[in-house]
Amino acid sequence: MSVLRGVGLGRRYGSGQTAVEALAGVDVEVRAGRLTVVRGPSGSGKTTLLNLLGGLDRPTSGRVLLGDDVLSELSEAELAAARRDRIGYVFQNFGLIPVLSAAENVEVPLRLRRMERGQRDERVAEVLELVGLTRHAGQRPGELSGGQQQRVGVARALVARPEVLIADEPTGQLDSETAERIMDLILEVTRIRGTATVVATHDPLLISRADEVLELRDGRVVAGNLA
């Protein structure tokens, strides 16, 4: 079942002779319980595409559909609610708040939803167990390894039980063994929870395990098996 779709997506920055076309005419479909990988060289438009799909940016042309909602037509408040409640993000640089513990970082999306304390505690404990960090719940990011920090990032992305998981180079700063653990975790969540997952990556192992692969070059699709 299609959960997230991009139809004819284009993104242009600037205007006139200095305009840069970062993305042009891209179609993509992300399905429940399946992993879609976006690959391509640096500067090919991978991050731009993920930003559009995740509602972090608006397309210059085309549409992004999350279920029946057209993200690019939502108000800022509606778009913020969709990002908060329906989409989880995993970033290459982890994006953790240094002064908060692992558990507190994971809890942030639930606080934004004004969820009751008891329910927040249950959700946080559940996802920390899922990523194998229960014993490290009280530690701050600076006390954790890179792999542990990325697992906190994954837990934070999952704690609100999103329909869509978007990950931009989630293994880019990790050693091969740790990267494989993160890949296994992302795949487990995709399969067991039925999450629609889209990942931008150069990692050949993760690419080989994808259900669908979309290859970008200079902002355009040059190959893919997204039929």
Residue ranges and their predicted role:
Residues 213-226:
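H-loop (His-switch) and adjacent beta-strand-loop-beta switch element
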Residues 3-209, 213-216:
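ABC family nucleotide-binding domain
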Residues 1-2, 226-227:
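Short, low-complexity, intrinsically disordered N-terminal peptides in bacterial proteins
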